[in-house]
Amino acid sequence: MAKYVSFFTYTSDAWARMIQSPGDRTATIRQVADSLGGSVECVYWMFGTHDGMVIIDVPDSISGAAMSIAAGSSGAFKTVETHELLTQEQLGQVLSRSKDATQAFQPPGQQS
Protein backbone atom coordinates (compact mmCIF):
# COMPACT_ATOMS: atom_id res chain seq x y z
CA MET A 1 0.00 0.00 0.00
CA ALA A 2 1.11 3.55 -0.69
CA LYS A 3 0.67 6.16 2.05
CA TYR A 4 -0.38 9.74 1.26
CA VAL A 5 -1.01 12.91 3.21
CA SER A 6 -3.43 15.50 1.85
CA PHE A 7 -3.66 19.01 3.27
CA PHE A 8 -6.90 20.76 2.39
CA THR A 9 -8.50 24.19 2.66
CA TYR A 10 -12.27 24.55 2.36
CA THR A 11 -14.03 27.30 0.42
CA SER A 12 -16.10 29.79 2.42
CA ASP A 13 -19.24 28.24 0.87
CA ALA A 14 -18.24 24.78 2.15
CA TRP A 15 -17.69 26.19 5.66
CA ALA A 16 -21.09 27.92 5.53
CA ARG A 17 -22.79 24.63 4.54
CA MET A 18 -21.00 22.74 7.35
CA ILE A 19 -22.04 25.38 9.90
CA GLN A 20 -25.68 25.02 8.82
CA SER A 21 -25.55 21.23 8.65
CA PRO A 22 -22.61 19.75 10.58
CA GLY A 23 -21.80 16.19 9.65
CA ASP A 24 -19.08 13.62 10.05
CA ARG A 25 -16.58 14.59 7.35
CA THR A 26 -14.29 11.75 8.44
CA ALA A 27 -16.98 9.24 7.46
CA THR A 28 -17.16 10.81 4.00
CA ILE A 29 -13.38 10.66 3.63
CA ARG A 30 -13.46 6.97 4.66
CA GLN A 31 -16.09 6.24 1.99
CA VAL A 32 -13.87 7.77 -0.69
CA ALA A 33 -10.79 5.85 0.50
CA ASP A 34 -12.83 2.61 0.67
CA SER A 35 -14.04 3.14 -2.91
CA LEU A 36 -10.39 3.10 -4.01
CA GLY A 37 -9.47 0.00 -2.02
CA GLY A 38 -7.78 2.08 0.67
CA SER A 39 -8.20 3.12 4.27
CA VAL A 40 -7.92 6.26 6.38
CA GLU A 41 -5.20 6.31 9.00
CA CYS A 42 -6.20 9.65 10.51
CA VAL A 43 -7.93 12.97 9.90
CA TYR A 44 -7.00 16.16 11.75
CA TRP A 45 -8.45 19.66 11.64
CA MET A 46 -6.18 22.68 12.08
CA PHE A 47 -5.95 26.44 12.07
CA GLY A 48 -3.65 28.30 9.70
CA THR A 49 -2.91 27.88 6.03
CA HIS A 50 -4.83 24.60 5.83
CA ASP A 51 -8.11 23.58 7.45
CA GLY A 52 -7.23 19.93 7.81
CA MET A 53 -5.19 16.95 6.76
CA VAL A 54 -5.79 13.28 6.11
CA ILE A 55 -3.38 10.35 5.93
CA ILE A 56 -4.57 7.49 3.75
CA ASP A 57 -3.28 4.12 2.61
CA VAL A 58 -4.21 3.23 -0.96
CA PRO A 59 -3.10 0.42 -3.28
CA ASP A 60 -0.99 2.58 -5.62
CA SER A 61 -0.13 6.04 -6.92
CA ILE A 62 -3.06 5.99 -9.35
CA SER A 63 -5.46 5.62 -6.41
CA GLY A 64 -3.69 8.39 -4.48
CA ALA A 65 -3.97 10.74 -7.44
CA ALA A 66 -7.61 9.75 -7.99
CA MET A 67 -8.53 10.62 -4.40
CA SER A 68 -6.79 14.00 -4.68
CA ILE A 69 -8.49 14.81 -8.00
CA ALA A 70 -11.90 13.70 -6.72
CA ALA A 71 -11.58 16.04 -3.74
CA GLY A 72 -10.13 18.89 -5.79
CA SER A 73 -12.85 18.70 -8.44
CA SER A 74 -15.69 18.69 -5.88
CA GLY A 75 -15.81 22.48 -5.56
CA ALA A 76 -15.63 22.24 -1.75
CA PHE A 77 -11.94 23.12 -1.53
CA LYS A 78 -9.78 26.13 -2.27
CA THR A 79 -6.74 23.86 -2.20
CA VAL A 80 -5.92 20.17 -1.94
CA GLU A 81 -2.21 19.41 -1.61
CA THR A 82 -1.29 15.71 -1.71
CA HIS A 83 2.10 14.14 -1.05
CA GLU A 84 3.27 10.53 -1.01
CA LEU A 85 4.85 9.58 2.30
CA LEU A 86 7.96 7.41 2.56
CA THR A 87 9.15 5.19 5.39
CA GLN A 88 12.78 5.29 6.50
CA GLU A 89 13.36 2.05 4.56
CA GLN A 90 11.87 3.56 1.40
CA LEU A 91 14.00 6.69 1.84
CA GLY A 92 17.09 4.46 1.96
CA GLN A 93 16.05 2.89 -1.34
CA VAL A 94 15.44 6.34 -2.85
CA LEU A 95 18.86 7.57 -1.73
CA SER A 96 20.56 4.46 -3.12
CA ARG A 97 18.91 4.94 -6.50
CA SER A 98 19.64 8.67 -6.35
CA LYS A 99 23.34 7.88 -5.98
CA ASP A 100 23.23 5.90 -9.25
CA ALA A 101 21.26 8.64 -10.98
CA THR A 102 23.62 11.36 -9.69
CA GLN A 103 26.60 9.52 -11.19
CA ALA A 104 24.82 9.27 -14.56
CA PHE A 105 23.55 12.88 -14.61
CA GLN A 106 25.36 15.49 -16.67
CA PRO A 107 24.49 19.16 -16.18
CA PRO A 108 23.51 21.08 -19.32
CA GLY A 109 26.56 22.08 -21.34
CA GLN A 110 28.78 19.38 -19.82
CA GLN A 111 28.48 16.53 -22.27
CA SER A 112 31.08 13.78 -22.41
Language-model segments: residues:
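A compositional/biophysical signature of low hydrophobicity enriched in polar/charged and small residues
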Residues: 1-112
